[in-house]
């Protein structure tokens, strides 16, 4: 698969106004600036030879996914009010037995918001009002099953 024509921003700080990314087997194989100033339709034709899928990213910024290092996404649910709030357990000041993985609702609208904002993974934890609030879980943000979203669950 090729992503072409967008503004490519790399982790190393390189920026190409008209760049391309080659992805094979889910991994970035190659990336760089498009040589010359060929119009995107001509590039699509060039890159789409064979079985290559081509995404025209003209007018878009293409960059690595962002990581949310600390949040309560899916625990303090958007639009649910108190019924969807599993964030803070107020019965004790120390609650190390709480596990975020048990409270996260991957159907929460916050997951869709995160994906649209470029956040590809997040460290989600229980409340912030307790001295010890429980254990966090590190998840991908795209998907609907918590079991499939988990990257690391201590």
Describe every region a protein language model picked out.
Residues 20-22, 123, 131, 136-138:
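Short beta-strand scaffold segments in enzyme catalytic cores
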Residues 48-50, 118:
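Short, structured coil segments at secondary-structure junctions
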Residues 60-126, 130:
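Metal-associated gating/positioning segment near the N- to mid-region
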Residues 16, 93, 132-134, 152:
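Short, solvent-exposed loop/turn segments at the edges of secondary structure
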Residues 2, 52-56:
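Conserved beta-strand scaffold positions in the cores of enzyme catalytic domains, especially
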């Amino acid at each position: 698969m090729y992503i072409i024509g967008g503004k490519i921003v790399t982790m190393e700080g390189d920026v190409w106004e008209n760049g391309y990314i080659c992805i094979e087997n889910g991994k970035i194989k190659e990336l760089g600036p498009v040589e010359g100033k060929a119009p995107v339709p001509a590039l699509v034709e060039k890159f789409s030879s064979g079985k290559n899928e081509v995404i025209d990213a003209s007018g878009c910024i293409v960059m690595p996914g962002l990581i949310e290092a600390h949040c309560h996404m899916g625990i303090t649910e958007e639009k649910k009010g108190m019924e969807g709030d599993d964030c803070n357990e107020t019965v004790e000041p120390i609650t190390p037995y709480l596990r975020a993985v048990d409270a996260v609702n991957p159907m929460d609208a916050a997951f869709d918001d995160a994906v649209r904002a470029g956040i590809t993974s997040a460290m989600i934890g229980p409340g912030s009002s307790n001295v010890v609030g429980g254990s966090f879980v590190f998840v991908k943000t795209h998907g609907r099953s918590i079991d499939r979203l988990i990257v690391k669950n201590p």
